[in-house]
């Protein structure tokens, strides 16, 4: 990690040796570490998992995250961590990795319970506006950001690819879905035409739950974890799922 910091942040050897490293264990996909430099500056390094343990749609997922974060930072007013360096050469590490700014505050999921109703309302309204700005970014084709060759001209085609990839992955590891694979594939495949209503590829975060929103003093300080971002239908966003879930 210290050698990576020398390369990514331009540290000298003495600065690297005095850098403090702390593993962050809240994530479920990438490995993440907090680095504190000798001058008390802090940053985060994220390291992608080994490629032999990935689902199909997770290929090139770190490339997708970096692209989505940089695009959001450049084209919107949504607060996202600044990326200092992205390295996919595998020269210093066998996996892709990137260094980014450390956000101030706490994940919204960790502090929402002791916030006032007014503060929660303000945070969630602000989050909705941020989400709308992300969805306001438009692409040229549909599909996962990190899988350009598999992107399609229609949302119907792109969603069909996502479905088949997920089912193929499940069959490969003998995952028990609770129903037969064809019971999932058949009804969806026969109704894919309804997706033709989605005519413009929008940037979709796809994992914008409270744990990926950092807040401080009643305000959003940043949004993280864009690795599952894709060009698709904004109704795939996390909070729209509540519309169909029974209370």
List PLM regions with ranges.
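Active-site Asp-x-Gly
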Residues: 156, 197, 201-204, 209-247
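A conserved long alpha-helix in the C-terminal portion of kinase-like catalytic domains
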Residues: 13, 173-183, 189, 221, ...
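Structural motif
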Residues: 9, 73-76, 245
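Juxta-kinase regulatory segment immediately upstream of eukaryotic protein kinase catalytic domains
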Residues: 1-17
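ATP-binding pocket architecture of kinase catalytic cores
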Residues: 19-175
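Extracytoplasmic/secreted proteins and extracellular or luminal domains
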Residues: 12-14, 76, 216
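Short Pro/Gly-enriched beta-strand edge/turn motifs at strand-loop
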Residues: 12-19, 64, 186-188, 193-195
